[in-house]
Regions:
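C-terminal regulatory domains involved in ligand/effector binding and gene-expression control
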Residues: 1-88, 93-305
């Protein structure tokens, strides 16, 4: 199985969640072994920012990368789409300090990347294989990665709220591109009305609305269309985790389990794994059949020499 990038450059304009201003976003193909990198198109001569867990300096409400004094925030939904589609090498140019929020899910990014198409590259795709269980814990919240032949994500939330059904606070995803697209990519972020009002008083979440989030008051979901899934809240937490985990630098072979985890704990887990080389191995596969993860069929990808 080989690395992949996109076939052609593509662009879109969205709204910044916190600024409320238009944000231009561009995706560009990259050579083998480049990885995922961000670049601020609004800052002349700004250095590229690698998608690395060690550059996460702020996890308040989202995962935010800072490198050389330059910031790119709210990267997790986009990284989730990139991970879900198995993209290894990509340049992301953004005209502001945050990735546009789009509809609050990863689905618009998935659509954009599919529109750009994919190219297989002449280098083996590298996976990080978890070989020892690693767990991080803060109070009653925890997250772990364990050895597993494939990639599975299990997540449990615990909200005591009448609008968040107790029967739908746990979810599991057996990762494949198809499962990601169908079961996870369209799950939206959510927020409580009281928190949004407080953020706006501090000039934050100015772009937040029911067009890009599930909004909940003290008793009800305020969006007229309701939920996309009965368990959309916990599905979105898995979506977030998938993006946060991709900051490890490779697709993962392992089982992710979490209870009430968030961006900070997800980042702590990745750093803990990378802190000890005996926790993992970097592996490759000779072909798609031997790889335990199913990505998009190669017949939908243009092979590039």
């Amino acid at each position: 199985m080989n690395q992949r990038t996109i076939k052609t450059a593509i662009a879109v304009t969205g709204t910044g969640l916190h600024s409320g201003q238009p944000v231009d976003l561009e995706f560009h193909p990259q050579p083998i072994n480049t990885g995922i990198i961000f670049e601020r198109s609004d800052i002349a001569g700004s250095e590229p920012i690698p998608a690395s867990a060690f550059l996460v300096q702020d996890t308040m409400m989202s995962s935010n990368l800072v490198f050389g004094g330059t910031r790119v925030g709210t990267v997790e939904h986009l990284l989730s789409a990139i991970a879900g589609l198995g993209v290894d090498n990509l340049l992301i140019r953004v005209s502001a300090s945050e990735i546009p929020i789009m509809d609050g899910s990863a689905a618009p990014f998935v659509g954009l990347l599919l529109q750009a198409g994919f190219c297989e590259q002449e280098a083996a795709k590298r996976f990080i294989k978890i070989v020892r269980p690693v767990r991080v814990k803060v109070d009653d919240k925890w997250a772990e990665l364990r050895p597993y032949d494939g990639f599975e994500l299990n997540f449990e939330i615990d909200f005591d709220h009448p609008a968040i059904n107790k029967d739908f606070q746990h979810a599991q995803l057996q990762f494949s591109t198809q499962n990601f697209i169908e079961q996870l990519s369209s799950a939206r972020t959510f927020g409580f009305l009281r928190d949004i009002e407080a953020l706006r008083q501090n000039n934050l979440a100015l772009g937040g609305s029911m067009d890009n989030a599930i909004v909940i008051d003290d008793a009800n979901i305020l969006n007229e269309e309701g939920l996309r899934f009965n368990d959309e809240f916990v599905r979105h937490k898995i979506l977030d985790a998938l993006g946060d985990l991709y900051l490890i630098g490779y697709p993962i072979l392992g089982r992710f389990n979490a209870y009430k985890s968030g961006h900070a704990l997800n980042n702590m887990l990745v750093r803990e794994i990378l802190s000890d080389p005996s926790n993992f191995e970097i592996v490759t596969f000779d072909d798609n059949v031997s790889c335990p993860i199913e990505y998009l069929p190669l017949n939908r990808i243009t092979v590039e020499g």
